[in-house]
């Protein structure tokens, strides 16, 4: 139930249950009607006051008790003024109520408009950001040249993420062999340089060397080639000598000659610098005899 409230226009009680307004439009309509009614009552005071003044004037002229007529006129004038002020207050109250109602409606509409503007602005900002993000996917345009731009942390993170993804893809088995890198080629060249000395083939005249034996000796195909004068320019003393050791436990085959090592080709006497042999046993290490063995052989000859 709605609480009872006095009506300043009618001076009675209104708003009884079932009589009051049910919607906002009906309430505003009733307020407008009450304001118009109060304004009309204020306008009706003018003819009433004119008729009261004429009556007082006639009664004062034709009556013998003029003093009594004056007192009644004073009381009527006071009541008329009070009634006029009351009507003015009612009209002012109705006007203020109507103005407040209109102001509240205007403020509500402004609030709704502001909310719609905020929603539109939010949608526009989101659309701009989404559009910029999509445009940046195609390619970023730098303000300065690339040489003068320091790499940002975000760029480093993206590079690190790409490297991680590449490593993850490389870790998976591939159906086809991967391309050889520069480090692989360098390591293969080094391995060939260290082990390639054991795979040399020598051609002496019509002879072709075969694969080296397990103990470092070399088998030469063909006839025995004696020392010829063509080898003398290679020797500083003019002597060419080959010391061949027989391979222990191996059988002599026809057409093959066992040669384990070559002598130092009569190196010149004097102090020589001995190079440190390579860690891996190669054919060059088996071809040359250490200088110490040459000294012991010379001592035995003496």
Curated annotation (Swiss-Prot):
One cellular component term from this protein's GO annotations in UniProt: cytoplasm
Main location: cytoplasm
Residue spans of biased composition, Polar residues class: 161-170
Keyword annotations from UniProtKB, A to Z: Cytoplasm, Cytoskeleton
Cellular localisation: Cytoplasm, Cytoskeleton
Region Disordered, residue ranges: 151-179, 220-256
Protein function: Involved in regulation of actin and microtubule organization. Part of a WAVE complex that activates the Arp2/3 complex.
Subunit details: Binds SCAR.
Family listed: Belongs to the ABI family.
Identification of the protein by name: Probable protein ABIL4
Source organism of the structure: Oryza sativa subsp. japonica
């Amino acid at each position: 139930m709605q609480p009872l409230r006095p009506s300043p226009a009618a001076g009675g009680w209104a708003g009884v249950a079932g009589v009051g307004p049910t919607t906002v439009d009906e309430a505003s309509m009733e307020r407008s009607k009450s304001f118009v009614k109060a304004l009309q009552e204020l306008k009706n005071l003018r003819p009433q006051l004119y008729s009261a003044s004429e009556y007082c004037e006639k009664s004062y002229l034709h009556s013998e008790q003029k003093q009594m007529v004056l007192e009644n006129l004073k009381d009527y004038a006071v009541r008329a003024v009070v009634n006029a002020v009351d009507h003015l207050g009612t009209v002012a109250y109705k006007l203020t109520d109507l103005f407040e109602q209109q102001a509240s409606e205007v403020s509500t509409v402004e609030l709704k408009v502001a909310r719609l503007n905020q929603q539109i602005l939010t949608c526009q900002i989101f659309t701009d950001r989404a559009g910029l993000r999509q445009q940046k996917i195609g390619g970023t345009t730098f303000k300065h040249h690339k040489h003068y731009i320091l790499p940002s942390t975000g760029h480093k993170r993206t590079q690190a993420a790409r490297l991680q993804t590449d490593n993850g893809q490389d870790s998976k088995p591939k159906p086809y062999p991967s391309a050889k890198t520069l480090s692989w080629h360098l390591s293969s060249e080094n391995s060939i340089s260290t082990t390639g000395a054991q795979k040399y083939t020598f051609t002496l005249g019509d002879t072709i060397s075969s694969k080296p034996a397990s103990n470092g000796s070399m088998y030469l195909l063909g006839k025995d080639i004696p020392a010829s004068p063509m080898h003398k320019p290679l020797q500083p003393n003019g002597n060419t000598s080959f010391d061949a050791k027989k391979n222990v436990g191996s059988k002599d085959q026809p057409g093959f000659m066992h040669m384990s090592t070559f002598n130092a080709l009569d190196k010149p006497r004097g102090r020589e610098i001995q190079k440190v042999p390579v860690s891996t046993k190669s054919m060059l290490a088996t071809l040359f005899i250490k200088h110490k063995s040459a000294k012991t052989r010379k001592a035995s000859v003496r």
